[in-house]
């Protein structure tokens, strides 16, 4: 069955959510890769101020996901999706006219918090509508997600030839259209409408006492830290191998990652599901993720086999990283729902995203420090060996998850959360 037929096989809310995510990522990524340059250039902010703005934007999203998830479970998925799109429209619109640091900070915080509102709600809504097709639904969702990431920067690059503020205005327009589209096309769906009324603190207590869920979040934090190296360690390695043509090599790595995500996602998911099943696929995917860094660990530079071979090792690592990331995402999203016991799904998604986001931030600081130390000592192998070790720990955590859940599966084989 082709991708188009699979897409048409989902109900209207699921299809709307997938298209919505495509639009969200186009609107976001047509702007964000170029924001720091605008802040430091035409707007004239100091480097510390640029870092502050980017940090506020990141924290207001990553740090607030659990708030968005909690609100979605209380007020329904659709209102939070619409509110998030509307707030991001306003945040980008403010960025068009912002000329001072306080106004830029407000705009950055608004755009970040908007993502914290709609992100858990979108995933909770899709999980509810997909029913038993969660893995397939999230695989298709990731195709739209990655397509937006690929196209967004290209659209932004074209608009930058005119003016950065036109790019920002266009991004605001995209989210404005998404707001209207969700109002018209997305049916109302109240999350956990039949559950007993509890306080927010009681809901949070349910989540933080869910040991299998926390084990998943901790293990996947390691996996996300490894996946993020397509933006950190691998580009830095490219600049070392090809200092005069590093951008060409980096573009090649991103092209490979994008092609795998968009063109291979459904095939990878189907093959993993048939070969290993939902639970074991997480372990296998994390194992491939850890193994992704073996090529660059064996050939960290051009001294042993030449620069060409080292470049091929780098591209191979990027390719394996892309395959592993594509393999993990659908099963990971299903696991969050399964471990929630279909209760407080958006709240679980929100906490999950916050835990992973904060963990990746800390992990990147550690990895960056390790890379600096390795460069001073001229021992690149330390970096790649450290990343492989992180992957091994993540695999061990996911295997431990099997131990947690082996005695608590319901009749459909989905993991059950503790009551």
From Swiss-Prot:
Keywords: Cell membrane, Membrane, Transmembrane, Transmembrane helix, Transport. It comes from the Bacteria. It is found in: Cell membrane. The keyword Transport applies. One of its GO terms (cellular component) is plasma membrane. CDD domains: MFS_MdtH_MDR_like. Pfam families: MFS_1. The chain crosses the membrane at residues 15-35, 36-56, 77-99, 104-126, 140-160, 166-186, 213-233, 246-266, 282-302, 309-329, 351-371, 377-397. InterPro entries: MFS (IPR011701), MFS_dom (IPR020846), MFS_trans_sf (IPR036259), Uncharacterized_MFS-type (IPR052425). One of its GO terms (molecular function) is transmembrane transporter activity. Its main location: membrane. PANTHER family: BLR5212 PROTEIN, CONSERVED PROTEIN. Belongs to the major facilitator superfamily. This is Putative uncharacterized MFS-type transporter MT0872. It comes from Mycobacterium tuberculosis (strain CDC 1551 / Oshkosh).
């Amino acid at each position: 069955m082709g991708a188009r037929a699979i897409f048409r096989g989902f109900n209207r809310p699921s299809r709307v959510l997938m298209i919505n995510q495509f639009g969200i990522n186009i609107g976001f990524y047509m702007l964000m890769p170029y924001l720091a340059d605008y802040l430091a250039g035409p707007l004239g902010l100091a480097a510390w101020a640029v870092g502050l703005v980017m940090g506020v934007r990141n924290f207001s999203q990553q740090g607030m996901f659990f708030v968005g998830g909690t609100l979605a479970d209380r007020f329904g998925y659709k209102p939070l999706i619409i509110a998030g799109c509307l707030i991001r429209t306003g945040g980008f619109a403010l960025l068009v006219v912002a000329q001072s640091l306080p106004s830029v900070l407000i705009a950055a915080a608004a755009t970040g918090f908007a993502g914290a509102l709609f992100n858990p709600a979108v995933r909770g809504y899709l999980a509810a509508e997909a029913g038993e097709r969660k893995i397939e639904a999230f695989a298709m969702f990731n195709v739209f997600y990655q397509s937006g990431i690929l196209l967004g920067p290209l659209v932004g690059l074209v608009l930058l030839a005119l003016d950065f503020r036109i790019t920002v205005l266009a991004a605001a327009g995209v989210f404005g259209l998404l707001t209207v589209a969700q109002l018209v096309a997305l049916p109302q769906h109240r999350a956990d409408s039949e559950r007993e009324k509890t306080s927010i603190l009681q809901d949070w207590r349910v989540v933080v006492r869910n040991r299998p869920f926390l084990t998943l979040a901790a293990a996947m934090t390691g996996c996300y830290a490894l996946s993020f190296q397509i933006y950190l360690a691998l580009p830095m390695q490219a600049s070392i191998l090809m200092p005069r043509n590093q951008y060409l090599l980096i573009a090649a790595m991103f092209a490979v990652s994008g092609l795998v995500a968009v063109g291979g996602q459904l095939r990878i998911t189907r093959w993993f599901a048939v070969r290993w099943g939902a639970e074991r696929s997480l372990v296998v995917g994390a194992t491939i993720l850890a193994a992704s860094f073996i090529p660059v660990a064996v050939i960290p530079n051009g001294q042993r086999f030449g620069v060409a071979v080292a470049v091929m090792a780098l591209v191979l690592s990027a390719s394996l990283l892309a395959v592993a990331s594509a393999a993990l995402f659908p099963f990971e999203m299903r696991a969050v729902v399964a471990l929630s016991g279909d209760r407080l799904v958006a709240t679980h998604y929100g906490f999950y995203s916050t835990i992973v986001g904060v963990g990746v931030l800390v992990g990147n600081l550690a990895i960056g420090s390790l890379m600096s130390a390795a460069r001073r000592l001229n021992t690149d192998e330390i970096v790649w060996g450290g990343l492989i070790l992180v992957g091994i720990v993540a695999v061990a955590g996911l295997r431990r998850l099997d131990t947690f859940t082996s005695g608590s599966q319901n009749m459909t084989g989905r993991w059950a959360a503790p009551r």
